[in-house]
Amino acid sequence: VRKVEVKKDIDPAPKLKTLMENIRQAADSPKKIVIPSSDGLHVIKISDISRCESSSNYTQFFLTTGKTMLASKTLKEFDGMLTDYNFERIHKSHLINMNFVKRYVQSDGGYVIMEDGSRIPVANRKKEHLVSLLRSL
C-alpha cells in the first residue's frame, strides 16, 4: 500500500504581493555610489552628480549642491558604473549627467552648458551622438 501525500493548495498571492512590494521599494529608493577619496569613502546619490571630470588618475565630481569631491579612481571606472543612469562621456576628460544639460552650442568647437553654468567641451567624434541624444529627450 502506497501512501499518497496530499498537498494543500497554497495561495501564492501573498508571496507575490510581498515580492512586488519589495521590487517597488527598490525601484523607488535613490541609487547611490561609493566614492573613495583620500579621507575615506563617501556615499552619494547618483542623482546628485551633475558631472565628472578626469584629473590624471583621479576623478573630480561636481554635485548639484555646489560641492566637489576628488575620487581616487579613473574616469573610465566611473563611466562604466554610471552609463545606466543617463551619464554620457562627451569628451576624454568629461562625463556628464544628461539630466543637467541646459544647452548645446555648436560654435567654438562645440560645447555643452550645464545647469550650474559650467561649459564642457564636446569631442568631435561625440558630437553627432550627443545631438541625437538631446533630440530624443
Locations of regions flagged by a protein language model:
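Receiver (REC) domain switch/output surface
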Residues: 1-7
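A general lysine-centric signal
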Residues: 92, 126-127
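C-terminal output/interaction extensions
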Residues: 127-137
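Conserved binding/recognition cores within well-folded domains
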Residues: 7-115, 121
